[in-house]
Amino acid sequence: MTEKLQPLRGMKDLLPDDYKVHDYIINKARDVGVLYGYKQMSTPLVEYTKVFNRSMGESSDVISKEIYSFLDKSNDFVALRPEFTACIIRSLISNRLQHKLPLKFFSTGPVFRYDRPQAGRQRQFHQLNYEYIGAKGAITDADTLKLAVDILKALEIEQDTTLELNSLGCNESRSVYQQKLVEYLNDFKDQLSEESKIRLSKNPMRILDSKSETDQKIIANAPVLSEYYTDESKEYFEELIQYLDILGMKYSINPRLVRGLDYYCHTAFEFTTKKLGSQSTILAGGRYDGLAKIMGNNDDVPAIGFAAGIERIALMREYNISEVKPVFVLPIGKNNICYALEIVDKLRTENIAIIIESLGKIAKRMQRIFNENAQFIIFIGDEEQANNNLKIKDLKKAEEYIVDFAKALELLKK
């Protein structure tokens, strides 16, 4: 018996109804981005693995556990992109766009992570991604956060999310804090989860993200980053808060919200929801001024960005999306098909969506049309062809018309 082929675990087909929702989300988000000056770009699905090793760190969960990396036929290690930011910065450097800064980029498409599949978390999923490159300062961060809020509003889910906000401070702040955090955690080293024991030597701030209940109890009394802010870091965060208050934005300061990579600084944020269980993060981002230099640029480039999961957004609410309903043309006999094709072609040039139903018996064709919930059917038989007319049936009004092409056009465009 022939094996029944299935998609890979954690990867799903996007059927027309799914794609309709995805397109709606993407178009809404793109339209808001345009109002903020963002321009769309795309990068390859496949990059050299070292692009992500540099950007995310070899000890990160994504690189150590989740990345799809393999040796290609040229003996190069390549990877399916697990996120967009590294790809965008790689593109900035390889296309020598530094002289055009500042730049605002919007991207969308699939990303891949070898994770345990569950609702809202698949191994292939789709993201909206925004990067504001070459602009520094709290005003830039406030503008980026307002963009995120406006996107969620356009998608009618902002009211079901909470903006969690923190400042990672400057390099000096984080360096002092990390030292104090390690000193604190060393006293509990034997009680930490196995994963956190590994992180303690490689990336201690990531322990603050631990899902282990034991780790969380230890973390509850750990030093807080804000206690070690320099004057510069305090002023930056206070300025950001001032701008958010002026914009009337609601937020919750979460002192445990961190990023474990050295190139992140100052603003970090997440929009979370209670509607999706454990997959509570809808949109997340932060400032990453140090990434470009790590990836080979001569200098640091200030940048801030965020990504949002399309599948998770789609789970947040039901979207009633109106569609263009096609007009169906039904030639009665085989000798009517040529005339029907002429009519179909003329109507499409007038931007009317048309489907020609010519296969099978009339009853079966009519059933297929009814299943599509169509409004108009154009019948073309010998009489219509001889008189150069069209018989149009309006299924919603239960009315029938026999008209010439000009009148038919007028009727169908109402």
Curated annotation (Swiss-Prot):
Locations listed in the record: Cytoplasm
Main location: cytoplasm
Keywords on record: Aminoacyl-tRNA synthetase, ATP-binding, Cytoplasm, Ligase, Nucleotide-binding, Protein biosynthesis
Gene Ontology BP term (one): histidyl-tRNA aminoacylation
InterPro entries attached to this UniProt entry: aa-tRNA-synth_II (IPR006195), aa-tRNA-synth_II/BPL/LPL (IPR045864), Anticodon-bd (IPR004154), Anticodon-bd_dom_sf (IPR036621), His-tRNA-ligase (IPR015807), HisRS-like_core (IPR041715), HisRS/HisZ (IPR004516), HisRS_anticodon (IPR033656)
Molecular function via GO: ATP binding; histidine-tRNA ligase activity
EC number: 6.1.1.21
Catalytic reaction list: tRNA(His) + L-histidine + ATP = L-histidyl-tRNA(His) + AMP + diphosphate + H(+)
Cellular compartments per GO CC: cytoplasm
Keyword field contains Protein biosynthesis: yes
Enzyme type, top EC level: ligase
SUPFAM superfamilies, per the entry: Class II aaRS ABD-related, Class II aaRS and biotin synthetases
Subunit description: Homodimer.
Record-given protein name: Histidine--tRNA ligase
Record organism: Rickettsia africae (strain ESF-5)
